[in-house]
């Protein structure tokens, strides 16, 4: 895979990248490097809540016929391993999700595809004209409390369909 090094402006940190299967760039940042403190002014008083555990996974939406190339890219370049594939319902069709995980286990990606052009994944791919971040899922200790805190800060939350929790119970049983 080809590498890329863009031009950095004055006082900007140059960040190398690798060209992904679709021609987009995957930037490479040294672990623990504080790039944000160099390139951005951080607001004082912001704290990470104790019940925030980190990012559970990032979901990437992509064209159905490109997923094998993405799997090979993550396996070859970064040593990711395959976890599991599942089929997820969308109001307008089915989404097939294949999880891959980094060798250290701290990065998990869901590579999502759909044959239907009406699903949220397909609409996202069409809107952005290719693969891209579809959502980020965060892990927390107390989901209801975290939702209440986010609503107090952010205001609006997406409505939850009436059958959402019934579907979760049917799928996972008493594991909730």
Regions found by a protein language model. Give the residues of each.
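Vicinal oxygen chelate
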Residues: 1-22, 53, 61-72, 76, ...
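Short beta-strand/turn micro-motifs at beta-sheet edges
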Residues: 44-48, 122-125
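Residues forming anionic-ligand binding surfaces in small-molecule and nucleic-acid pockets
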Residues: 47-55
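Internal, well-ordered alpha/beta segment that forms a basic, Gly-enriched binding/recognition surface
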Residues: 9-47
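Core active-site phosphate/anionic-ligand binding loop and the adjoining beta-turn-alpha structural block
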Residues: 58
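Phosphate-binding active sites in nucleotide-utilizing proteins
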Residues: 74, 79-80, 111
């Amino acid at each position: 895979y080809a590498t890329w090094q863009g031009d950095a402006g004055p006082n900007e940190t140059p960040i190398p990248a690798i060209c992904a299967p679709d021609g987009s760039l995957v930037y490479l940042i040294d672990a623990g490097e504080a790039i944000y403190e160099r390139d951005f002014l951080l607001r004082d008083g912001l704290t990470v809540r104790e019940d925030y555990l980190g990012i559970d996974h990032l979901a990437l939406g992509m064209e159905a016929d490109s997923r094998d190339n993405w799997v090979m890219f993550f396996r070859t370049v970064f040593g990711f391993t395959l976890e599991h594939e599942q089929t997820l319902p969308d109001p307008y069709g089915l989404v097939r999700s294949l999880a891959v995980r980094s060798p250290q286990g701290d990065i998990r990606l869901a590579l999502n595809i759909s044959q239907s052009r009406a699903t949220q994944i397909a609409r996202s791919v069409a809107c952005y004209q290719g693969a891209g971040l579809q959502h980020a899922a965060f892990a927390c200790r107390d989901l209801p409390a975290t939702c209440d805190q986010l609503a107090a800060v952010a205001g609006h939350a997406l409505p939850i369909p009436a059958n959402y929790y019934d579907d979760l119970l049917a799928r996972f049983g008493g594991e909730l």
